[in-house]
A protein has these predicted regions:
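N-terminal, positively charged nucleic-acid-binding surface of large information/translation enzymes
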Residues: 2-191
């Protein structure tokens, strides 16, 4: 039985240790190996609750992603072939408000001063503004997730899949009408 010795550190330079581990993972293709060595095993599929790419990542994202990564690594240690699917949340009021501010328009101007198609095109571009920063964070924190083929919530395939699933839930009687208090923004005209 062979013995392996862990590297000993005299001083605690966590940034240096992190760089060394990331380099070792890159050299050994560790993330890919964690998948290929489990071909044929039971699968566990993880869809990341996607971050919004139109905002910069913060410490709360690091904390949430750490928990997500722990779950996936735990399932990997249990012998599962873990598929980790990244995604981008591209819907929402912050995207629209940011584009309107950048263009100097209001909701009422959409369809008159700017076509709906042009507005949507600009929103799609702007929502992906910080993807490079997110991808750097993903790598630097050692978060293992497949960023090569993310699901994107503005993609028609994604939207049609949700419509299909909602229709299936409706057919099975699993949707119901209810009443809740909703936040309202007078400035954005939402509610």
């Amino acid at each position: 039985m062979g013995s392996s010795k862990f590297k000993e550190y005299k001083g605690l330079d966590l940034s240096q240790i992190n760089r060394e581990i990331l380099e070792q993972w890159d050299r050994n293709d560790a993330f890919h190996q964690s998948i290929t060595t489990r071909e044929g095993h039971p699968t566990f599929v993880f869809y990341e609750g996607p971050p919004s790419a139109n905002g910069t990542p913060g410490i709360h994202h690091v904390m949430a992603r750490t928990i997500k990564d722990i779950v996936c690594r735990y399932k990997t240690q249990q012998g599962f072939l873990v598929h980790r699917k990244a995604g981008w949340d591209t819907h929402g009021l912050p995207v629209e408000l940011g584009v309107e501010k950048k263009l100097g328009i209001t909701k009422e101007d959409i369809g008159t001063k700017i076509s709906i198609e042009e507005y949507n095109r600009i929103c799609r571009r702007e929502v992906m503004t910080y993807t490079d920063m997110w991808e750097r964070l993903t790598r630097d924190m050692g978060y293992w997730i497949n960023m090569d083929d993310p699901y994107i919530t503005y993609d028609n395939k994604y939207i049609e899949t949700l419509w299909f699933l909602l229709a299936e839930l409706y057919k099975k009687g699993l949707l119901y009408k209810g009443y809740t208090i909703q936040p309202y923004s007078p400035a954005a005209g939402t509610g």
